[in-house]
């Protein structure tokens, strides 16, 4: 079935749907990972985005339950050069087309993904529409222009949980948290309050491996309830959308950093930046992929990192805050810490999924910060 992709500037490509009849829109981006398509599809941070895979053959190893990063698919669409219909992998339980159809998400192959990637690299990520129903590019261009821009758009409410939950036995578990915030911890690790703005499950796995007992809570979980919970630290998760729009969450973080040790990844890092007086700017085409070089300024160590963000933190000489990590491709900020408060954060994804594990040590670094804070 023919599918037409049209960007807001009129750039047009023709492909073929491998998931049936549809029309959908969103911000069109590209990711440079050769693998990890299932993790990308199920990462809530990709909510509202149509993802172009730069590697030409996608779906070779199928899909499986173990590679899920949430309970569903959040990408608006998957754009590939060629989709493999018959995977070869002993772990696979479903082909990529079957997986996409199960979650009712569009997939398109036969696109010139190289041309699309070059266009986005030169002109920036932009809104687009892909349709099997409308054949007039001018009509689809107007529809693309009518879509909300990512800048200024709060997408967290679409992916955040409505009530608290725990993570153990490698799964989400229902729990009861009292009205005042008090909670009966299981005693399996250091109590950690996790603000879920659209978290990846592998972050929760890595927190457990680092010796934490995570309790995930919705974005509206108040500082008073956080204090009453008995948690020894706070973790702020990844998530979609423009961080500058999350004014109530920024105010929340501003209080939390004076109560407990705090760390964050991706959107959580950006919220910490805002709370400390920094600002965020939108990147031209974002950082999406498993091969971004980062330098840890505290050790001089170079890491290859997994990244997925369209915004970045700009410090602008913020008092008492220093950079800890920098991206070696474009020199943008990848990590920060407060000089006196037990606060640190990272823009990239040390939990990987998919990607290299060079940054896993940072979960233990935060645990050490909590220990030092408790002993102070």
From Swiss-Prot:
Sequence segments annotated as region (CPSase): 1-187
SMART domains in alphabetical order: CPSase_sm_chain
Record's keyword annotation contains ATP-binding: yes
UniProt KW keywords: Amino-acid biosynthesis, Arginine biosynthesis, ATP-binding, Glutamine amidotransferase, Ligase, Nucleotide-binding, Pyrimidine biosynthesis
Catalysis: reaction(s): hydrogencarbonate + L-glutamine + 2 ATP + H2O = carbamoyl phosphate + L-glutamate + 2 ADP + phosphate + 2 H(+)
E.C. number(s) listed in UniProt: 6.3.5.5
Binding site for L-glutamine: 45, 239, 241, 267, 270, 308, 310-311
Signal sequence interval, chain numbering: none
GO MF annotation list: ATP binding; carbamoyl-phosphate synthase (glutamine-hydrolyzing) activity; glutaminase activity
Pathway: Amino-acid biosynthesis; L-arginine biosynthesis; carbamoyl phosphate from bicarbonate: step 1/1; Pyrimidine metabolism; UMP biosynthesis via de novo pathway; (S)-dihydroorotate from bicarbonate: step 1/3
GO biological process: 'de novo' pyrimidine nucleobase biosynthetic process; 'de novo' UMP biosynthetic process; glutamine metabolic process; L-arginine biosynthetic process
Pfam families (UniProt xref): CPSase_sm_chain (PF00988), GATase (PF00117)
Keyword rRNA-binding (UniProt): no
List of catalytic residues: 266 (nucleophile), 349, 351
HAMAP family: CPSase_S_chain
Known partners and oligomeric status: Composed of two chains; the small (or glutamine) chain promotes the hydrolysis of glutamine to ammonia, which is used by the large (or ammonia) chain to synthesize carbamoyl phosphate. Tetramer of heterodimers (alpha,beta)4.
Functional note: Small subunit of the glutamine-dependent carbamoyl phosphate synthetase (CPSase). CPSase catalyzes the formation of carbamoyl phosphate from the ammonia moiety of glutamine, carbonate, and phosphate donated by ATP, constituting the first step of 2 biosynthetic pathways, one leading to arginine and/or urea and the other to pyrimidine nucleotides. The small subunit (glutamine amidotransferase) binds and cleaves glutamine to supply the large subunit with the substrate ammonia.
Protein's name in the database: Carbamoyl phosphate synthase small chain
Organism name: Desulfovibrio desulfuricans (strain ATCC 27774 / DSM 6949 / MB)
Gene from which the chain derives: carA
């Amino acid at each position: 079935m023919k599918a037409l992709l049209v960007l807001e500037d009129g750039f047009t490509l023709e492909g073929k749907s491998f998931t049936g009849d549809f029309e959908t829109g969103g911000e069109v981006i590209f990711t440079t990972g050769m693998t990890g398509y299932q993790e990308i599809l199920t990462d809530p941070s990709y909510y509202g985005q149509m993802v172009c895979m730069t590697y030409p053959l996608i779906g070779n190893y199928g899909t499986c339950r173990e590679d899920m990063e949430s309970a569903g698919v959040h990408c608006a669409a998957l754009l590939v050069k060629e989709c493999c219909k018959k995977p070869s992998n002993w772990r696979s339980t479903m082909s990529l087309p079957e997986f996409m159809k199960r979650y009712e998400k569009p997939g398109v192959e036969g696109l010139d993904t190289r041309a699309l990637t070059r266009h986005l690299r030169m002109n920036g990520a932009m809104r687009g529409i892909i349709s099997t129903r409308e054949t007039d590019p001018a009509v689809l261009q107007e529809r693309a222009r009518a879509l909300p821009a990512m800048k200024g758009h709060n997408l967290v409410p679409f992916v955040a949980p409505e009530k608290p939950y725990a993570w153990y036995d490698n799964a989400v578990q229902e729990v009861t948290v009292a009205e005042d915030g008090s909670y009966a911890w299981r005693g399996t690790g250091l109590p950690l309050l996790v603000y879920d703005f659209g978290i990846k499950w592998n972050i929760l796995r890595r927190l457990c491996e680092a010796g934490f007992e995570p309790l995930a809570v919705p974005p509206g979980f108040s500082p008073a309830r956080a204090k009453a919970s008995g948690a020894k630290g706070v973790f702020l998760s990844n998530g979609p959308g423009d961080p500058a729009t999350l004014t109530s969450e920024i105010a929340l973080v501003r209080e939390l950093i004076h109560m407990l040790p705090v760390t964050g990844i991706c959107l959580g890092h950006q919220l910490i930046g805002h709370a400390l007086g920094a600002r965020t700017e939108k990147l031209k085409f974002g950082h999406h992929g498993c091969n971004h070089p980062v330098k840890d300024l505290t050790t001089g160590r170079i890491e290859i990192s997994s990244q997925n963000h369209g915004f970045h933190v700009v410090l602008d000489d913020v008092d008492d805050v220093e950079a800890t990590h920098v991206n070696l491709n474009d020199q943008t900020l990848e990590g920060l810490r407060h000089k006196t408060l037990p606060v640190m954060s990272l823009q990239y994804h040390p939990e990987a999924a998919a990607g290299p594990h060079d940054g896993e040590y940072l979960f233990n670094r935060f645990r050490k910060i909590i220990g030092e804070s408790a002993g102070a």
